[in-house]
Amino acid sequence: MRIVSTLASLLFVFLGLHLPWLANAANAASGRYLEVTYPPSQNTNELVLGVTYRLWIPEGAKTIRGVIVHQHGCGVGSRKGAETGAQDLHWQALAKKWDCALLAPSYHQEEKDNCRLWCDPRNGSHKTFLRGLADFAKQSGHPELERAPWCLWGHSGGGFWASIMQTMYPERIVGIWFRSGTAFETWERGDIPKPEISTAAYSVPMMMNPGVKENGDKRFNGAWTGSLAMFKAYRAKGAPVGFAPDPRTNHETGDSRYLAIPFFDACLKLRLPEAGGKTQVLKPVDQKTAWLAELLSDSAQSAASFKGDRKTSVWLPDANFAIAWKQYVKTGATEDNTPPPAPTDLKATTKADGINLTWQAETDFESGLTAFIIQRDGEMLAQFPEKPQNKFGRPLFQNMTYGDTPVAPLLDFQFTDKTAKLGAKHEYRIVTVNSVGKQSPPSQGAAIGR
């Protein structure tokens, strides 16, 4: 089922814009899609750019416990790439685990537009963001969406936006992942008004994630220095903030999702109120249960055993995350020794062009989804897709953009065996392959011609 607001539909028909995320919505995990679009406002202190918000709600979620916000960076390419953000299978897996919605904004910035018209939320984007949540709450029949807490992921200008939102709405934020972007140095230089930073803002869990190759880069050095400066300043105040430099990348997001998703998983576990409770107030972070590391090191210890200076240490939410963090800062990715879940609901149907196979699949929570092996009568028939793509990281079933969103058009969970002879008897099975090459057990079989 998919719900799209009337305003959004009319606006995009008028503008003649293509919506690849809607055209391919069937491939994503079971759930509902909603969309709202707001035109530019001419009112003082309101957003002067248009924006589209796209939301995914997992099937079976009775109460929405939070909203995972995947915020793109500056520029036309970033905002176009964000059109598929709500369809990302791996981020959907995180949302589904915690009964959260997945939200992907796309600000209608053109090349001539100053990014700060939206990435400084004080220029109106914070009001439109709240308006979007309120409208989604009405559309979806989930009134709790309007007040649900947020996980904020931001790349570049999206991190800039998130750092200011943190000063405005700290009580709403479960945690923040800053991928190569923050407004900290910008306000410290006086280029934008410096926000008031409350005690509550220093209680929000954060992870700074710049690319090591940004350090000294002519264009993106500020992403490195800004991330490091914000880390040092906030950690000195006792904030639960970590530093996870990506050794393989410059400003692109690379394979950062394999650490960002575990980070939010740990923060949601630490901070969400009990499911089914009456409150949406977040739990405080108990830093005694954390793991700590020296800055720019690749080893970590429990807080109880750490002997260094805590005010300069890297904060890590728990032991499991610390293991992944150590792997990531060494290699730019994380390990996974477990197989993905087997596909389900395999169906085989005779069509004019061959045997059509459809199935469902859960995304491997640790390492995502790369491909499916199609088996016929116990032997490998094909791999789908034949050559998974991703020039920024591990090849995936959903090819990735520079900004960690799926490349359109998106693939469905279906395959046609065009080599089967008409009327022949065959049994098919499907195997899931994750991004480290681990294979699931085969699915239940689906017979044809019997």
Task: Locate the predicted segments by residue.
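Cap/lid segment of the alpha/beta-hydrolase catalytic domain
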Residues: K96, L102-K127
